Amino acid sequence: MAAERKTRLSKNLLRMKFMQRGLDSETKKQLEEEEKKIISEEHWYLDLPELKEKESFIIEEQSFLLCEDLLYGRMSFRGFNPEVEKLMLQMNAKHKAEEVEDETVELDVSDEEMARRYETLVGTIGKKFARKRDHANYEEDENGDITPIKAKKMFLKPQD
């Protein structure tokens, strides 16, 4: 049985140049056919399922009005890019003007209310820094305002 089988050399060994000189025409044809199969286009084609396209989250608007009030895109801070900072000032000038107008219109506290708050503040801070014996000299009004009690200094007659 062992004698019936002929040992064959590997394909890689037969492809080497020095081995091809002594090969038969049949084995040469077989090697060429195998090489053609390896190099053919079908060999390099990948049988992968087609990739699904990802859902696009693009929203299309008919009008460009949404883009009108946007700030200028390029930004620079602390003098890093002076040219861009100049452009920022020009492009964002109208937004700053609108913000300044909004700040002047909004008054959180009126002048009268500020004056009342200042009066109460003077009393509370005065009480905070007063000496211990002077703490008793402060009293609260019905509004919760703390005011100092100033006792008039008068001459006391000595009693006989």
From Swiss-Prot:
Name the UniProt record assigns to this protein: M-phase phosphoprotein 6
CC terms in the record's Gene Ontology section: cytosol; exosome (RNase complex); nucleolus; nucleoplasm; nucleus
Locations listed in the record: Nucleus, Nucleolus; Cytoplasm
In-chain residues carrying the UniProt-annotated modification Phosphothreonine: T147
Transmembrane residue ranges: none
GO biological process, one term: maturation of 5.8S rRNA
Any Pfam family hit: MPP6
Subunit: Associates with the RNA exosome complex, mediated by EXOSC3. Interacts with ARHGAP18. Interacts with exosome cofactors EXOSC10 and MTREX.
Keywords (A to Z) from UniProt: Cytoplasm, Isopeptide bond, Nucleus, Phosphoprotein, RNA-binding, rRNA processing, Ubl conjugation
Record note on modification: Phosphorylated in M (mitotic) phase.
Positions bearing the Glycyl lysine isopeptide (Lys-Gly) (interchain with G-Cter in SUMO2) cross-link: K37, K86, K127, K150, K153
Taxonomic source organism: Homo sapiens
Major subcellular site: nucleus
Sequence similarity: Belongs to the MPP6 family.
Residue ranges annotated as motif Nuclear localization signal: 116-133
Residues that bear Phosphoserine: S110
